């Protein structure tokens, strides 16, 4: 479909324009499990501002299940350290509102209110592979569940 790396759209919005379709009609497969993305997953992909990836010139997204799984694997393999909001601002030398911080679970960019919530509740931000992570409002309440034996 897209052979030249220069012409490959990187965002879902740009891909829709290139294919002359809309976000409501585009069909993508998951890059990991190869299953077609459900409509809600396409919307989540766009809302999370994730990047379209290409395999053999074909565009792929990622389904919710694979995204959460890969996020957890990345956390386990590439966790560096955690800091409080004030320390993060001093380290990066930028205010929190200018720092890209994604949700550690669903990878959505955190809005200013979600970042403020971390500071107000004295919760830490995590450095994973050189990128900053916290929890969005939707994932805030979801906790790791222990399996009963």
From Swiss-Prot:
A motif (PDZ-binding domain) lies at residues 147-149. The keyword Protein biosynthesis does not apply. GO terms for biological process: DNA-templated transcription; regulation of DNA-templated transcription; symbiont-mediated perturbation of host apoptosis; symbiont-mediated perturbation of host ubiquitin-like protein modification; symbiont-mediated suppression of host cytoplasmic pattern recognition receptor signaling pathway via inhibition of IRF3 activity; symbiont-mediated suppression of host type I interferon-mediated signaling pathway. GO terms for cellular component: host cell cytoplasm; host cell nucleus. The keyword Magnesium does not apply. Keywords: Activator, DNA-binding, Early protein, Host cytoplasm, Host nucleus, Host-virus interaction, Inhibition of host innate immune response by virus, Inhibition of host IRF3 by virus, Inhibition of host RLR pathway by virus, Metal-binding, Modulation of host cell apoptosis by virus, Oncogene, Transcription, Transcription regulation, Viral immunoevasion, Zinc, Zinc-finger. HAMAP family: HPV_E6. Belongs to the papillomaviridae E6 protein family. This protein may be involved in the oncogenic potential of this virus (cervical neoplasia-associated virus). Forms homodimers. Interacts with ubiquitin-protein ligase UBE3A/E6-AP and thus forms a complex with human TP53. Interacts with human NFX1 and MAGI3. Interacts with human IRF3; this interaction inhibits the establishment of antiviral state. Interacts with human TYK2; this interaction inhibits JAK-STAT activation by interferon alpha. Interacts with host DLG1; this interaction leads to the proteasomal degradation of DLG1. This is Protein E6. The gene is E6.
């Amino acid at each position: 479909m897209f052979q030249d790396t220069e012409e490959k759209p990187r965002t879902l919005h740009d891909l829709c324009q290139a294919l002359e379709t809309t976000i409501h009609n585009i069909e993508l497969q998951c890059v990991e499990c190869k299953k077609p993305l459900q409509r809600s997953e396409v919307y989540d992909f766009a809302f999370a501002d994730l990047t379209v990836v290409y395999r053999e010139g074909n565009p792929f997204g990622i389904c919710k299940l694979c995204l959460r799984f890969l996020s957890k694997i990345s956390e386990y393999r590439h966790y560096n350290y955690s800091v409080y909001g004030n320390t993060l601002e001093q380290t990066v030398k930028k205010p929190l509102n200018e720092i890209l911080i994604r949700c550690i679970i669903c990878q959505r960019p955190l809005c200013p209110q979600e970042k403020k919530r971390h500071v107000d509740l004295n919760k830490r931000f995590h450095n994973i592979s050189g990128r900053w992570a916290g929890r969005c409002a939707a994932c805030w309440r979801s906790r790791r569940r222990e399996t009963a034996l």
